[in-house]
Amino acid sequence: MSIIKGTGMVADRLSVAVIQTSLNADAAWQSLAQTGDWRESIRMSSTEERRAKGEIRQFLSSIKNTGKTPDIILLPELAVPLGFERQLVRMAESMESIVIAGLDYQLDGDPAAKRVSNESIVIVPRRLKGRTIASQTATRRVGKTYPAPAEEEKLRRTGVTFSKRPTVWIFESSEL
């Protein structure tokens, strides 16, 4: 992949780190029969949430300790518990790397409607690779439009409807 650097030159490489936590999906998102409450079934369990946060911190620390910070850090969909966004922003700023992370489900509107949505967060720190590119760190949310078939089936069995978020963002940078 070639990208334009701030110098106008084409870079030969884009460094990307992918962090995959070891969440157990069945433990993280328990069935309605296990929880008795659909809201609990669509939220990551507290045990798996603690594990996910710990693993994310550990992986990011390990990456930082290599001395070779990536241009972009990816965390797949549903990998990041809700409420962990501020820590991700601080980590992106500390590492001077863009972070694209998939967040856990969130309730969509009136709880009586039993609707959930899913988003990712894109964090662009004000500094990339030692170079200031903006006056402050920017965050954007990108909505998910279609759930995977197995995901949609599990939500259906829980009595929950998936709210589509047909969002398209185009990111352009002369600094990468």
Locations of regions flagged by a protein language model:
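Short, low-complexity, polar/charged sequence segments that are solvent-exposed and flexible
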Residues: 35-40, 92-95, 159-162
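Hydrophobic alpha-helical segments
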Residues: 29, 34, 85, 90-91, ...
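Active-site catalytic loop in hydrolytic enzyme cores
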Residues: 1-4, 113-176
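Active-site beta-loop-alpha junctions enriched in small/polar residues
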Residues: 21, 104-106, 145-147
